[in-house]
Amino acid sequence: MKTRTEKDTFGPIEVPEQHLWGAQTQRSLHFFAISTEKMPVPLVAAMARLKRAAAKVNAELGELDPQVADAIMRAADEVVAGKWPDEFPLSVWQTGSGTQSNMNMNEVLANRASELLGGERGEGRKVHPNDHVNRGQSSNDTFPTAMHVAAAVEVEHRVLPALKALRGTLAAKSAAFYDIVKIGRTHLQDATPLTLGQEISGYVAQLDLAEQQIRATLAGLHQLAIGGTAVGTGLNAHPQFSAKVSAELAHDTGSAFVSAPNKFQALASHEALLFAHGALKTLAAGLMKIANDVRWLASGPRSGLGEISIPENEPGSSIMPGKVNPTQCEAVTMLAAQVMGNDVAINVGGASGNFELNVFKPLVIHNFLQSVRLLADGMVSFDKHCAAGIEPNRERITELVERSLMLVTALNPHIGYDKAAQIAKKAHKENLSLKEAALALGHLTEAQFAEWVVPGDMTNARR
């Protein structure tokens, strides 16, 4: 393998010639060959956007040669566009400040910008990773800034659109099935009737609440640490740098980014990310409930509840011919569990800051962005391959309503709780219908039963 010599404050080190990274990235690859998790692509893109904004602002403030700034910006644009995916190989499991990933970006942009200026990589380059690309910055403020940018952009452009689409599908199903009377269930036991549309409307409301809660967290994610530099004081950064870079990032992404009012907090803790992920966890809990309900309602096809049918997408068993499983529901429940686990890790990371810096940053953003991707992709898949194809099995629904003992609840206002309970118990013990049991006990007439026990009237859907 052909190499070139790169140097940092520890001295020279050989770097593969074909790569744009430099000495500090190479050292990180050597010392942190841990597991397979790499820095998430959205974080890399956010860091490149930040470096682009910083170069532009530094040039405007007279802190950086305009030609050098332009080359850095062009190099950063290439990274954002996905041109150099193999240049960011570092493990999540590295320094807790993300310093090595910040330097990975600085080195790649410095070498690429040097090439764009007609120079070369390595010692003879025209752009320096620290003096130029990292001008007015520290890993301690750039990495948390990139964390917030990546988190906000991914939530706004992935999670919320997927949530809205699934919500729309379920709302349409709720409206279409609003007059289908079915038996309700509490404690996994028969309860009073409702309509299938009413039941699904509960799912829609869950998603509405989740969206409201997620949107309420965005203001915190929009506050950026940039300008705090090493410990929050802003040492070596131009006084206008923070506000201008935040405004540039807002313009670049379309998100409402602003400079965080207190940089000490922005470096030392991650409440905004904890709060936001808490809302994602709540969405995960709702999705788990919805997916579980759907697979129970579709259970069967001949020995389960069987009240609804869902799409049959693929064979379900390697031994049982013809078996089809609720695989989309299972995928959603698994990813929801993973998001809940991620929340625990993020909470531990968020609680583990010391003095002026939290050093669990890579852990926090790795888990956050994994949750975002799981939720967004999971909702898109569940919507397309399951929810859109939900159909009622009307005959089965009617059969279960007519067999339910809990219709007896409609008699409470007319004959009282105790007599109604006698009817239900007699019907259950002797395998009678409610009507047969009621007439046998003499608590009401056939006409009264027909007038008082009307499942549709018990749902309030017709009022």
UniProtKB/Swiss-Prot annotation:
PROSITE patterns: FUMARATE_LYASES. The active site is at H187, S317. Substrate binds at residues 97-99, 125, 128-131, 138-140, 186, 318, 323-325. Gene3D superfamilies: Fumarase/aspartase (C-terminal domain), Fumarase/aspartase (Central domain), Fumarase/aspartase (N-terminal domain). Residues 121-134 have a biased composition (Basic and acidic residues). The record marks E330 as: Important for catalytic activity. Pfam families: FumaraseC_C (PF10415), Lyase_1 (PF00206). One of its GO terms (molecular function) is fumarate hydratase activity. Keywords: Cytoplasm, Lyase, Tricarboxylic acid cycle. Residues 121-142 are annotated as: Disordered. GO terms for biological process: fumarate metabolic process; malate metabolic process; tricarboxylic acid cycle. Its EC number is 4.2.1.2. It is found in: Cytoplasm. Pathway: Carbohydrate metabolism; tricarboxylic acid cycle; (S)-malate from fumarate: step 1/1. One of its GO terms (cellular component) is cytoplasm. It catalyses: (S)-malate = fumarate + H2O. Homotetramer. There are 2 substrate-binding sites: the catalytic A site, and the non-catalytic B site that may play a role in the transfer of substrate or product between the active site and the solvent. Alternatively, the B site may bind allosteric effectors. NCBIfam families: fumC_II, PRK12273.1. Involved in the TCA cycle. Catalyzes the stereospecific interconversion of fumarate to L-malate. PANTHER family: ASPARTATEAMMONIA/ARGININOSUCCINATE/ADENYLOSUCCINATE LYASE (PTHR11444), FUMARATE HYDRATASE, MITOCHONDRIAL (PTHR11444:SF1). Belongs to the class-II fumarase/aspartase family. Fumarase subfamily. This is Fumarate hydratase class II. The lineage of its organism: Bacteria, Pseudomonadati, Pseudomonadota, Betaproteobacteria, Burkholderiales.
